[in-house]
Regions:
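Hydrophobic alpha-helical segments within soluble ligand-binding/sensing domains
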Residues: 149-172, 270-290
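Bacterial signal peptide processing site
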Residues: 25-28
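C-terminal motif of bacterial Sec signal peptides marking the signal peptidase cleavage site
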Residues: 20-23
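Periplasmic-binding protein-like
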Residues: 56-57, 108-116, 135-137, 225-236, ...
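Flexible loop/hinge segments that line or gate small-molecule binding clefts
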Residues: 127-150, 256-265
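An alpha-beta-alpha
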Residues: 74, 159-202, 206, 294-314
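Extracytoplasmic "Venus flytrap"
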Residues: 53-80, 86-93, 116, 180-185
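Segments of small-molecule ligand-sensing domains
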Residues: 290-392
């Protein structure tokens, strides 16, 4: 609203300059016209500019999984602002630029790249569309017209690993990881390190999957492998649902608040929530104060959230999480500090050293204790055709 009043004041000042200062003072001549009888007729017009429009580009369908929850965050943040938002979903990396063009033609001066899979393309495409301001979710480095917004879900994964191990009888934990999710490798490693705080020699079996059919096969394989607790870090909601069907204890990376009470095997869940960040972006856009900066979502600022433990968890699980949360928030959990070895036993980091955020984000290796069971992702032979339908 403040920006609207500023625009009205600016318009009034411009009118004063056009008519002369005297014409804006009380008692002087206004912009009145006379009708055929000579009676003065005052014409008063108020010009209001349209609110800014922000377009979102989603990699997956907004009807399910993490993308559905991210879309809900878009809508909830917009409810508290004057910003209009719209989106295109199911956009592949190759169609990303086409979606940018479509949203630009729709009047979007701001575009949210709402998946880390676009990060490798965003820099070059943003440089071709300097009239557009971009917000890259899952991006760590900003540039002239790109606001970088990333998060550290591995903080929550550390807690998930501890919870999984404490509730395991076999000391064998499974994790289904979607490589397209933010920092999938650090998430697996953090979960393994958390697990090892409970059982030093425990094993974390990792299976990679994305689509519903793939994650279902991954869960089945982990159960066959002897894993009695499974951590789900996937876009798909099918991972958690399959665990529930099999009666296997699990931890979800999706917000289960709406139906947690009906999930008999759920231990806890953790989520990455950009709602408050998006609201702050909307406000800056409305006030014309937006600049391309950087944001990192953590447990401390409420972007990364860890739920209370659920009834399926053992007694004492909540005590572990409650003791860990303050340390995660103040940075004293030291997840990736001290000696770290990879799966071959090679020392990657020495004692009294700590990985930087940049080192963590770019991890391509797994810590000792992680075994890769299989990659259940199938090659994509035919990319779906996107018609760039814009929805509100």
């Amino acid at each position: 609203m403040a920006s609207l009043w500023l625009k009205r004041i600016s318009a009034a000042l411009a009118l004063c300059l056009t008519l002369g200062v005297a014409g804006c003072k009380g008692g002087s001549t206004s912009d009145a016209e006379t009708d055929e009888t000579g009676t003065a007729q005052t014409s008063e017009t108020t010009e209001e500019s349209e609110p800014s429009k922000v377009g979102f580009i989603f990699n997956s369908d907004v009807d399910s999984g993490y993308t559905a929850q991210l879309n809900d965050q878009r809508l909830r943040a917009a409810e508290h602002s004057d910003i209009v938002t719209c989106y295109i979903d199911n956009v592949s990396i190759t169609d990303f630029e086409g979606a940018v063009k479509a949203l630009s033609a729709e009047g979007c001066d701001y575009i949210v790249s709402a998946s880390p899979v676009y990060d490798s393309s965003l820099t070059s495409i943003a440089s071709k569309y300097m009239n557009i301001s971009f917000i890259g979710l899952g991006r760590a480095t900003n540039s002239f017209n790109i606001y970088a917004a990333t998060a550290q879900p591995y903080q929550a994964a550390y807690a998930a690993g501890m919870t999984a191990a404490y509730n395991s009888e076999s000391e064998k934990i499974g994790i289904v990881a979607d490589p397209d999710m933010l920092y999938a490798t650090p998430v697996v490693n953090a979960a393994a390190l958390g697990m090892q705080l409970v059982y030093k020699d425990a094993v974390m079996s990792t299976a990679f999957a994305t689509k519903d059919s793939e994650v279902e096969a991954a869960v089945n394989a982990l159960v066959d492998e002897g894993c009695d607790v499974i951590i789900c870090y996937t876009e798909s909601a099918r991972t958690a649902d399959r665990c529930e069907e099999l009666g296997v204890k699990y931890i979800s990376s999706l917000d289960c608040a709406a139906d947690a009470s009906s999930r008999e095997s759920l231990l806890m869940y953790f989520t990455t929530t950009y709602e408050n960040f998006l609201l702050s972006q909307y406000k800056q856009i409305a006030l014309h104060t937006w600049v391309s900066e950087s944001y990192t979502g953590t447990t401390a600022n409420g972007c990364v959230n860890i739920s209370a433990v659920q009834p399926a968890a053992k007694d004492g699980t909540q005590d572990i999480i409650s003791a860990l949360l303050p340390k995660l928030s103040n940075g004293s959990a030291y997840i990736f500090e001290g000696q770290l070895k990879d799966t071959s036993g090679t020392v990657r980091y020495m004692k009294n050293t700590a990985m930087t955020s940049e080192d963590i984000y770019s991890m391509t290796w797994y810590v000792q204790g992680v075994t890769v069971l299989d990659n259940f992702r199938q090659p994509i032979t035919d990319l779906p055709t996107n018609d760039f339908v814009i929805k509100y």
